[in-house]
C-alpha cells in the first residue's frame, strides 16, 4: 500500500524564508537514526504528548496544536504547497516559534508517521482527546477508534463485490473529525486483501478547520485517496476543498469518472428493462 514518507518535513518552509531559519543540527539527525518500526504505537503516543507539552510553553496548548496541524497539512497539500499564499501562511506560523520549537515540530511529525506506519488507527484524534483540547461548545468529541472499527465492520459487507464491479469503493463522512471512521473502513479493506490506496475514495467534511486539517494529515500519510472539505454540511457552505496526495498519484479523478459512467449505464439498462 502507498504511504507517504516526509523525512524532510518543513524543509520547504525553511527555504521559503521563515523569520528564524532553522539549521539542522547533529542531535536532530541522530534522533531520526532510530528505525521507526522499533517504536510502538504506545511509545510514540507517550513521546508525542511529552514533547508537545515541552514545546512553546509560553503559548496556549490549543494554539500550539492548531499551528502544528496547520503546518503539517499545508506541507502535505501538494496542490498548494508551493503557492505564495501557503508560503506566507507557513512563514507567519513559524515566526511565532524559536528554533528548538521548530525542531520539536519535526520530531512530533516523525512520531506521528511512526505510529501510523505501525498500524491503521486514529493516532492524532486520540492525542487530541488525551490532551483535552476538544471544544464543548462545538460538541467536539472524537469517538474511540475501537467503536469506529466496530461501526466500519457493519458497513463493509459486500465490499469485494463492489470493488470487482465498480473498481473502487466510496465512503462519505459529513462530520469526519480526524477521519477515524474512514481509517477504520480502510483497515477493513486491508483485512479483506483490498488495497485502499487503489480502491477506496473517501469524501470528508468538517466545520472545524483544525479537525479538517487532522483528517487531511492522517488520510494523506496513510495513503487514502480523499476529498477533505472544510465547511458546514447542514448549510452547504464550504470554505476549502483539498485532495490527498494519493488522489493525484493514483489518478482517482479518472477512476471516479469511470465509476459514474458505469453507474449511469447500469441505471439506463435497468430503466430499459423495466420499460420492456
Language model features with spans:
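Conserved S-adenosyl-L-methionine
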Residues: 145-247
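Class I S-adenosyl-L-methionine
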Residues: 2-17, 21-22, 26-193, 234, ...
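Charged/polar, low-hydrophobicity segments characteristic of intrinsically disordered regions
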Residues: 29, 105-109, 213-217
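Generic hydrophobic segment detector
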Residues: 117-122, 185-191, 215-226, 259-276
Amino acid at each position: 500500500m502507498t504511504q507517504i514518507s516526509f523525512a524532510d518535513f518543513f524543509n520547504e518552509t525553511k527555504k521559503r524564508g521563515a523569520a528564524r531559519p532553522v539549521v539542522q543540527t547533529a542531535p536532530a539527525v541522530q534522533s531520526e537514526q532510530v528505525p521507526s518500526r522499533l517504536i510502538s504505537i504506545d511509545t510514540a503516543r507517550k513521546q508525542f504528548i511529552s514533547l508537545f507539552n515541552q514545546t512553546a510553553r509560553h503559548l496556549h496548548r490549543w494554539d500550539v496544536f492548531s499551528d502544528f496541524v496547520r503546518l503539517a497539512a499545508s506541507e502535505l497539500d501538494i496542490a498548494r504547497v508551493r503557492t505564495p499564499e501557503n508560503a506566507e501562511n507557513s512563514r507567519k506560523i513559524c515566526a511565532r516559534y524559536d528554533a528548538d520549537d521548530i525542531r520539536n515540530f519535526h520530531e512530533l511529525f516523525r512520531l506521528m508517521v511512526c505510529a501510523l506506519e505501525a498500524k491503521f488507527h486514529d493516532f492524532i484524534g486520540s492525542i487530541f482527546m488525551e490532551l483535552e483540547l476538544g471544544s464543548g461548545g462545538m460538541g467536539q468529541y472524537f469517538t474511540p477508534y475501537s467503536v469506529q472499527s466496530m461501526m466500519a465492520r457493519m458497513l463493509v459487507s459486500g465490499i469485494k463485490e463492489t470493488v470487482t464491479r465498480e473498481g473502487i469503493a466510496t465512503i462519505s463522512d459529513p462530520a469526519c473529525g480526524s477521519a477515524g471512521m474512514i481509517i477504520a473502513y480502510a483497515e477493513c479493506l486491508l483485512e479483506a486483501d483490498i488495497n485502499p490506496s487503489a480502491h477506496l475514495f473517501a469524501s470528508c467534511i468538517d466545520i472545524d478547520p483544525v479537525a479538517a486539517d487532522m483528517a487531511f494529515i492522517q488520510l494523506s500519510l496513510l495513503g487514502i485517496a480523499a476529498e477533505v472539505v472544510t465547511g458546514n454540511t447542514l448549510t452547504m457552505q464550504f470554505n476549502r476543498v483539498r485532495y490527498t496526495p494519493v488522489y493525484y498519484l493514483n489518478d482517482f479523478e479518472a477512476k471516479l469518472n469511470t465509476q459514474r459512467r458505469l453507474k449511469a449505464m447500469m441505471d439506463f439498462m435497468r430503466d430499459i428493462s423495466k420499460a420492456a
